[in-house]
A protein has these predicted regions:
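A residue-level marker of the well-folded mature domains of exported/periplasmic proteins
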Residues: 3-4, 21-170
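Bacterial N-terminal signal peptides
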Residues: 8-17
């Protein structure tokens, strides 16, 4: 009987320690992520950001994906501004409709990282993506060399309002 009492006391002590050590998660750094679409590589990027945030106490990552809807993306970015995020990460769907709201976030002092597609302004903290102008130039030279400077080519472009399509065309 005495053994069961000691075992019960031990279990209560352990459970009490677990309960008291489980404090409420305090968010000290809120990251807002606005994704333009939910294709596989963006889905993987989201998972990696969420996984990385697990290594840091107090970091919360909130991801919103708009499935190629400019108006919804602008609304989501405004949501992040009003929520007072500490960092905003934006993968713009199209540059023109998203630029003003990204500028608003930047003007309010929120660091903004633009990913994959640029905006039509320099009002962002950092850009992570390809040099699409150079990519377009290299592809053009490659095709011209293959055709020995003769014939006509056809350009297949991406989303008309996206900066990769614009830059690669130039």
């Amino acid at each position: 009987m005495r053994r069961y009492i000691y075992l019960l006391l031990f279990v209560l002590l352990v459970c009490g320690g677990i309960v008291t050590s489980c404090s409420r998660h305090e968010v000290r750094f809120h990251i807002g992520v606005s994704q333009c679409s939910d294709d596989e590589w963006r889905h993987q990027m989201n998972n990696e950001m969420l996984r990385e945030a697990l290594f840091y106490d107090g970091v919360e990552v909130e991801i919103r994906t708009v499935k190629d809807d400019n108006a919804r993306q602008a609304e989501d970015i405004r949501h992040f501004i009003e929520a007072g995020v500490d960092l905003l990460i934006v993968a713009p769907n199209e540059a023109e409709p998203i630029t003003p709201v990204v500028e608003e976030a930047y003007d309010r002092g929120i660091p903004v990282i633009v990913v994959d597609r640029r905006i039509l302004s320099e009002k962002y903290t950092a850009y992570v993506g390809a040099d699409n102008y150079e990519i377009g130039k290299a592809i053009g030279k490659y095709v011209a060399n293959m055709r020995h400077g003769k014939g006509t080519g056809v350009e297949i472009a991406g989303l008309a309002g996206s900066t990769p399509a614009i830059d690669r065309h130039e």
